[in-house]
Amino acid sequence: MSSDDTVKQEHSCSADSEKQDSSCASDNEQPKEPQSPRNIHGLLWVVTILAIYSSTFLFALDNTIVANIQPAIISSLNGIEKLAWSGVAFVMASSATVLTWLQIFNQFNIKWMYIFSIAVFMGGSAICGAAQSMDMLIGGRVICGIGGVGQYVGVMNFLPRLTTMQERPMYVSAMGLTWGAGTVLGPIIGGAFTDSSAGWRWSFYINLVVGGLFAPVYIFLLPSLEPQPAGTTVSSRLKRMDLVGTLILFAAFAAGVIGINFAGAMYPWSEPGIIVAITLGGVLFIVFGIQQTYCILTTEETRLFPVELVSWRQPLLSLLFVCGCCTGVCVTVPTYVIPLYFQFTEGDESLQSGVRLLPFVCLLVFSCVSGGYLAGRLGYYIPWYIMGGGFCLIGSALMYTIKPSSGPGATYGYSSLIGLGSGMYLQLGHAVAQAKVKPEKVPAAVAFTTTAQLNGLTFALVLSQCVFVNEAAKRIGWILPHEPRSTIVDAISGTGSTFVQELPTATQNEVLGAIVTAIDRTYILCIVAAAVTLLATLGMKWERLFIEAAAAA
């Protein structure tokens, strides 16, 4: 054997030995925890995440804070014909601008756009608190809705960048806890301010206090995240935004919501203006869909809606969108109508009627936190949609049977089932969608699931008010055929409650029964939403998504 062959053999043996040692070493090593993507830890991280969640809480709070304080607002500002807009203006503005905010956060510095959205929200809150007319209040609510949803999208952009894949379901569910808690605590907090010496204006001023408290955290602790390469000009960033789609979508929401909101309450359904508004809204939504699908005056990269996530071959994201809309419905309807039920049947004041939501709130918060934690630990997501949809369906069907004589216990128990079910998948879709897409598509997934939830909330509020007002007015009209419709609408809106109290006892009981029946009808929306959720699970897979995604990462 030559010296060269000897060297080669020794080298080969040495290499084999190294490989064997390396293999043994790797077998003995424990799997490493995923490296944290954030550079703040410990107490500073706790303070930072609390500050982030506080903005989500305030946004959710403003969704429903006017639910049971509208009579006090009307008493101060007048303008009964614009009553419903104190709530609808906020959710309409949020739904119409959520996709635009997503593009803004995808083009500009995330930290400073987040702070800008908070400033817009605080400005709108100041206008609402200082409002001297209903028009001023409605304008402030629109500004609040635009800024509030910007905060929400900002949080959904921060969390994926500051948490690991394994942590994410827990943090997203914790955000769901704050969002759900804010949504259902809105009537309680609003009622507390209204019934106290502070008055209803502090329902809006409180946002300024909380925002000011956490302002140093936003400015000094939040990391500066730049989504675009350094040196990218403002003009080039704006060119990557779909301004045409933004205008079409906002106009579609405005027309559709105006038509549905005013129909029956202010004008008959046959009114030409109502027909035109509803028709125009529908046409504009179709135009928006065509413009986005075929990239008219936009491109595949810059279009507003993430059409690429909608696929027949991989339907999971589309099913998550549907379930997101459904959970928005199941949270919104009880939040608005349970206080209304107790105001009419028990004569509750604003605060007391809001407190009646606590069983619903507690179960929603519990299931949201526990569901998010267990989904992250176990990896499966489909069981939470099945159980959540089932509980919502049972609870909603039982709430449909409520009568004036049912008593508080039945309402507490039945609504708790809805809270338990809706909490199970309230925020789960955000984590699932982000885990199913490539890293560069995470912002689009955020837009997709956030849009679903806000759309469900918006149309649940608009449609439930429409169903309640029209059903109650129709049934009371049968009982009191000689009363003007405007008087009846005022009474069922909460601004003319003395009208009901002054009726003879027998007639009063009939009217009360008609009102409760109208409230029951709103739960048809929840029944349908829960049933659709269960149907959607038929297209989902049993997969350990979060564990697999974390391993791949």
Curated annotation (Swiss-Prot):
<dbReference type="GO" id="GO:0005886">
    <property type="term" value="C:plasma membrane"/>
</dbReference>
<dbReference type="InterPro" id="IPR020846">
    <property type="entry name" value="MFS_dom"/>
</dbReference>
<feature type="transmembrane region" description="Helical">
    <location>
        <begin position="243"/>
        <end position="263"/>
    </location>
</feature>
<dbReference type="GO" id="GO:0055085">
    <property type="term" value="P:transmembrane transport"/>
</dbReference>
<feature type="transmembrane region" description="Helical">
    <location>
        <begin position="85"/>
        <end position="105"/>
    </location>
</feature>
<feature type="transmembrane region" description="Helical">
    <location>
        <begin position="319"/>
        <end position="339"/>
    </location>
</feature>
<feature type="transmembrane region" description="Helical">
    <location>
        <begin position="110"/>
        <end position="130"/>
    </location>
</feature>
<keyword id="KW-0812">Transmembrane</keyword>
<comment type="similarity">
    <text>Belongs to the major facilitator superfamily. TCR/Tet family.</text>
</comment>
<keyword id="KW-1003">Cell membrane</keyword>
<protein>
    <recommendedName>
        <fullName>Efflux pump alnA</fullName>
    </recommendedName>
</protein>
<dbReference type="GO" id="GO:0022857">
    <property type="term" value="F:transmembrane transporter activity"/>
</dbReference>
<feature type="compositionally biased region" description="Basic and acidic residues">
    <location>
        <begin position="1"/>
        <end position="21"/>
    </location>
</feature>
<dbReference type="InterPro" id="IPR011701">
    <property type="entry name" value="MFS"/>
</dbReference>
<feature type="transmembrane region" description="Helical">
    <location>
        <begin position="40"/>
        <end position="60"/>
    </location>
</feature>
<feature type="transmembrane region" description="Helical">
    <location>
        <begin position="355"/>
        <end position="375"/>
    </location>
</feature>
<keyword id="KW-0813">Transport</keyword>
<feature type="transmembrane region" description="Helical">
    <location>
        <begin position="270"/>
        <end position="290"/>
    </location>
</feature>
<dbReference type="Pfam" id="PF07690">
    <property type="entry name" value="MFS_1"/>
</dbReference>
<feature type="transmembrane region" description="Helical">
    <location>
        <begin position="136"/>
        <end position="156"/>
    </location>
</feature>
<comment type="function">
    <text>Efflux pump; part of the gene cluster that mediates the biosynthesis of asperlin, a polyketide showing anti-inflammatory, antitumor and antibiotic activities. Is probably involved in the efflux of asperlin.</text>
</comment>
<dbReference type="InterPro" id="IPR036259">
    <property type="entry name" value="MFS_trans_sf"/>
</dbReference>
<feature type="transmembrane region" description="Helical">
    <location>
        <begin position="382"/>
        <end position="402"/>
    </location>
</feature>
<keyword id="KW-1133">Transmembrane helix</keyword>
<feature type="transmembrane region" description="Helical">
    <location>
        <begin position="174"/>
        <end position="194"/>
    </location>
</feature>
<feature type="region of interest" description="Disordered">
    <location>
        <begin position="1"/>
        <end position="36"/>
    </location>
</feature>
<feature type="transmembrane region" description="Helical">
    <location>
        <begin position="413"/>
        <end position="433"/>
    </location>
</feature>
<feature type="transmembrane region" description="Helical">
    <location>
        <begin position="522"/>
        <end position="542"/>
    </location>
</feature>
<feature type="transmembrane region" description="Helical">
    <location>
        <begin position="202"/>
        <end position="222"/>
    </location>
</feature>
<keyword id="KW-0472">Membrane</keyword>
